[in-house]
Amino acid sequence: MRGDYRGLYRCGGQGLATVLRGLLACGLVLLLWLGLPGEAAAQLHRHADENGVAVVRSLESLRDLDYQTWQLVAYRQGPPGGPLLLRIVGYPGKVRLDHPTALLVSSGRSSWQLSDLTLANPQLAGDGRSAAAEFDLAPLLADLQQNRPLRLRLPGVFTELPVPPFVVMEWRSLPTAPD
């Protein structure tokens, strides 16, 4: 009878070693997977506008705290050092944006008030849907030292629109991004 137990023990020992090796392999795969940087949803895109001027932009759709979706387009026109703008677009018919209305931005104890430049853009100024607004992004980007989350507030339109750190990181890369 003892021989039967020894054979079972040997077989179980080999089975246990196989299971442990499998668990170790799964653990290593999991660690490698978690250690790799994830891809962000937003990306910098490069193209030329209708006048042939180089444009570098970050495009992201985000929801405010009332679950309304907004498209945020941060872009730079021309070579590095060119104008930096943030366009916020709502769905036509659902929202009407009055101009000029400053965009209020906060992060921790810091806050900014971005100037409304919508009426300076002939395309947006002539758009009867009034579903878009454009703001000067340069003062915000000049002050940001980290990729911290931001909270946007547009009085009379939305009370809070959270902007995640990966989007802030892309916005911060706009001033120096190659054409």
Identify the residue ranges that each predicted region occupies:
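Bacterial N-terminal signal peptides
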Residues: 12-35
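Boundary at the C-terminal end of the N-terminal hydrophobic targeting segment
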Residues: 40-44
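Low-complexity, acidic Ser/Thr/Pro/Gly-rich terminal tails and inter-domain linkers that flank the onset
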Residues: 45-79
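A short, compositionally biased
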Residues: 52-58, 97-101, 143-149
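Short, surface-exposed binding/anchoring microloops in extracellular/periplasmic proteins
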Residues: 68-104
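Short, solvent-exposed, Trp/other aromatic-anchored flexible loops in extracytoplasmic proteins
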Residues: 109-158
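Short beta-strand elements
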Residues: 162-179
